[in-house]
């Protein structure tokens, strides 16, 4: 919250702030589908925060909360990131360049479709002042 306020304060008029953030619904999908961790999936549904080995503590917030913290900002774009990529459990495919290209095309195609964005693992927000 404080970081968003500070960035909004120094952002120039017509400047763009780019924020990539965890998406709770995507994390629930990850816990339930990929990790078979129903306890963590239910805890997330109950509003609890989470942890990740690469990120440490994950404190979830809604995309709209950013505007509450810094009302001078406007959300201009929201993209879903990693909607399908991690759902492919055959790790050998992840190294195949043809598979990567096809998956990236699919990911880019659904990145701004609301129904897919809702379950993406991450959201990328572009905010303007």
Model-derived segments and spans:
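Short, conserved clusters of charged catalytic residues that mark active-site
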Residues: 2, 61, 108-111
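Short alpha-helix
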Residues: 55-78
């Amino acid at each position: 919250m404080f970081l968003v306020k500070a960035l909004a304060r120094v952002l120039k008029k017509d400047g763009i702030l780019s924020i990539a953030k965890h998406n709770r619904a995507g994390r629930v999908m990850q816990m339930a589908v990929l990790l078979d961790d129903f306890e963590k999936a239910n805890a997330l549904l109950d509003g609890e925060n989470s942890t990740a080995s690469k990120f440490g503590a994950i404190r979830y917030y809604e995309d709209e909360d950013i505007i509450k913290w810094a009302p001078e900002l406007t959300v201009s774009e929201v993209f879903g990131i990693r909607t399908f990529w991690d759902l492919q459990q055959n790790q050998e495919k992840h190294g195949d360049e043809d598979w990567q290209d096809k998956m990236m095309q699919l990911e880019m195609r659904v990145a701004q479709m609301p129904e897919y964005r809702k379950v993406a693992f991450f959201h990328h927000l572009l905010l303007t002042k």
